[in-house]
Swiss-Prot record:
Expressed by the liver and secreted in plasma. GO terms for cellular component: extracellular space. It is found in: Secreted. This is Alpha-1-acid glycoprotein 1. Contains a beta-barrel that binds various ligands in its interior. It comes from Mus caroli (Ryukyu mouse).
Amino acid sequence: MALHMILVMLSLLPLLEAQNPEHVNITIGEPITNETLSWLSDKWFFIGAAVLNPDYRQEIQKMQMVFFNITPNLINDTMELREYHTIDDHCVYNSTHLGIQRENGTLSKYVGGVKIFADLIVLRKHGAFMLAFDLKDEKKRGLSLNAKRPDITPELREVFQKAVKHVGMDESEIIFVDWKKDKCGQQEKKQLELEKETKKDPEEGQA
C-alpha cells in the first residue's frame, strides 16, 4: 500500500534549520513523550504528500482516500497502524507496526532486515502531523501530511505548502487525496466489530 510504503521507506534525518521558523512552524527532532503518544492514539486521515521518488509518487497517485488508526504501546515503544485505502473505488485494509524512538523523535520499521527511520513533526495546534523522509536526497525526498479531520483548514494547507517549499520541493509536487471518495466506511465498521468480538472471547472464557 502506498501509505505503508511512505511510512516504512524512510531515512534518518538531521535537525532541519528553518530559515523562517515563524512561518514554517515545524520542529524536527522533538522527543516523543507519553503525552505525544496519547495524542497520536486516534483516527487519522492521510491528506497528501509531496514525494520526488517516482515509484512512491506513482503509488500515491493511485490512492483516492486513506485513513488509519494509531494504537501506541507505551511499554514496548511500538505503535499499531490499521490502514484503510480506497483504490479504484475499492477498500483495502492493512495492518502494520512501527517502532518509536522517543529521544530522537522518530518512527522506524524493519525492511529487508534494515531498520529505517522517519522524523515525526507534530502540528498539535492544527490537529495534524507530518512525516519527513529522505530530505538529503534531491531525487527522493518527501513530506506527508496527516490530520484528525479530512477537511483541513486553509491555514493548515498553507503550513504544509510552505513546509514543502522549505525542504526544497515545489507546491506542484503535492498530491492531495479526496476524502469524499472514501469507500472504506463499511470495512472499518466490520473491522471494529471483529476487534470487539476478539476482546470478548477471552473474557467469556474466564467467566
